[in-house]
Amino acid sequence: MEELLERVFSFSDVDKLIDFISYELQKPVILESADFFLLAYNSYYINHFDSANQQTIFSKKCPVQIFERFLKDGIIEKLKTEPEPFRVNKIESIGLNQRVVVSAKHKGEVMGYIWIQELDQNLTDEELDFLYETSFHVGKIIYKTNKLKQEKEEKAEDLIKRAIYQQFTSEKELRREAERINTVLPSMFSVVILHAANGDGEAVEDLKENIRSYLNLRDKVSHVLTIESNIVIVVASFSQKSSVSSAASEFINKLLTHFHFQKIPTPIYIGIGNEYNHLLKLGKSYTEALEVIKAAEITGNQENIPYEYAKLGIYRYLESIEQKNEFLEYENKDLALLKAKDEESSTELLKTLEIYLLNNCKTKPAAEQLFIHQNTLNYRIKQITEMTSIDLSDFRTRCQLYLDLMLMKKK
């Protein structure tokens, strides 16, 4: 193997190196970058590329549906953490045959991924060792190529930050600067913020990189950056015919479906700013997304807080109301009574009241949401009205109660 490795280390061109690996192993090889774009490929027999390989080659990147499946199955996470080659079993639904993959690293950082389709015979232990040793040289070559790309990404991030902080006097000035650094800016956009409630640990940074990879595979128009420990995503579109708001909502749904939030040891709050077609409104959309985050922080969760600022409604006033309540040392005595009763008797009167109010005081949907019988709900509501001075027939009382319930959650 030493002689083979000497040959490997003599290569400085990644295409020639992948050709050599494919020839020696006599198997199809795909090399992708850390953000899953095609860098090089070769097959000892050209017809041996499976459907997944073919899709990657034709589109010059990992297809989104394959990336989503890898996220769901934990393969993306394993690529980031597993140092040695590992097998990925056949997945017929995405046209993927069994293969071995190893991360190509340089100085501990993942530069890309080497995929070897195993076909009829599995790689031997010696071949796996060869692949592992080779991966570091592949990582080194990619690293040298990536330097210029990284500088460009940093310039693009800085441009977006300056736009968010409203440091440009006109859109013409902003577009001129984008053209100078060769950065594509959208025709329409919406700012999405992901906020980790208790800091910005390593897991959150990994999440940011996965989001960046996903968005790059999707459209290469959107931008992902970090501002004050928030993951900030500019969900974008070239065309004013397509709805960015719908794209942002769809992106959040994909995020919740495929990205493993449960592995992040802190709550993640999500905010979506309004859609705009004027680049100087980036800061406004960003501020709107932050308003959603603040509302979720005040209530301690996002159970009832919508992601979209446009749907935030009365929740946008929670921060102002909270500040005024603190100044006046206000406390809703009726809710305090119910809270004390819940703690004393393990009842769920506060939760019952909240769900009842959310359902416009309609018994059937409220009971269904609480998973209790309507008679049980009626009994609880009777308890609440008998214990307190609450008049649920009064609209203003219902509004006040609901706001006070939301603010009570933070305590």
Swiss-Prot record:
The keyword Transcription regulation applies. Keywords: Activator, DNA-binding, Transcription, Transcription regulation. Gene3D superfamilies: PucR C-terminal helix-turn-helix domain. Transmembrane segments: none annotated. Induction: PrcR expression is not subject to autoregulation and proline induction. Disulfide bonds: none annotated. InterPro entries: CdaR-like_regulators (IPR051448), CdaR_GGDEF (IPR041522), PucR_C-HTH_dom (IPR025736), PucR_C-HTH_sf (IPR042070). GO terms for biological process: positive regulation of DNA-templated transcription. Disruption phenotype: Mutant loses the ability to utilize proline as either sole nitrogen or sole carbon source. It comes from the Bacteria. GO terms for molecular function: DNA binding; DNA-binding transcription factor activity. PANTHER family: CARBOHYDRATE DIACID REGULATOR (PTHR33744), DNA-BINDING TRANSCRIPTIONAL ACTIVATOR ADER (PTHR33744:SF1). Belongs to the CdaR family. Activates transcription of the putBCP operon. Requires proline as a coactivator. This is Proline-responsive transcriptional activator PutR. It comes from Bacillus subtilis (strain 168).
